[in-house]
A protein has these predicted regions:
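A Trp-anchored, charged/polar loop motif used as the substrate-binding/catalytic surface
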Residues: 16-31
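C-terminal helix-and-tail extensions that cap enzymatic domains
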Residues: 1-10, 27-165
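Active-site-adjacent substrate-binding region
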Residues: 13
């Protein structure tokens, strides 16, 4: 996909290549070479900005990033889809943009206006936070109550009952 088209689709929200801090655009051979030994988690939420329907902009880009890293022989890349839907506003948000962040950082109760703060949400937050913490420690995303997470092309679906596809 041409980079200017990608930039337009993402509303200009791409990393700015400055040649120093960000030396190359993600998924270019140069960027992949720099980070080839670093395991990565990449994923999206189910609805992003489209309540009631599956995301069609961010998800394909995340899958492509995982595919590119895998094809380049990089360290493992772990793909996820966050499908848990917020009950807030009678469920109108679904699994909206950035909803996984309170779960990854185990801040579900702190952000109950976004998450609803229910028991299932709190438990999922505990599990997801352990997954990310273990990944930071070992390079392997794992936690009790979460299926063994295999690298791409597998996909971890986080929900009340998480599953590996």
């Amino acid at each position: 996909m041409p980079e200017n088209l990608l930039d337009a689709l993402l509303f200009g929200a791409l990393p700015v290549v400055d040649g120093e801090v960000i030396p190359a655009a993600p998924s270019t051979p140069e960027a992949l070479a720099i980070s080839k030994d670093i395991p990565v988690i990449v994923g999206t939420v189910y609805n992003e900005f489209t309540p009631g329907q599956e995301d069609t902009i961010f998800r394909p880009l995340a899958v492509q990033q995982a595919a590119d890293r895998s094809a380049a022989g990089c360290a493992p890349v772990y793909l996820y889809l966050f499908k848990w839907a917020s009950p807030v506003l009678d469920g109108a948000l679904g699994s909206t943009h950035c909803l996984e962040l309170p779960f990854v950082f185990d801040n579900v109760l702190l952000h109950r206006t976004f998450t609803g703060g229910g028991e299932d949400a709190v438990e999922l937050g505990h599990r997801m936070s352990r997954v990310w913490t273990n990944f930071a420690k070992t390079g392997i995303p794992s936690a009790d109550g979460i299926p063994s997470w295999e690298p791409y092309p597998h996909n971890m679906v986080f929900d009340i009952k998480s599953v590996l596809e």
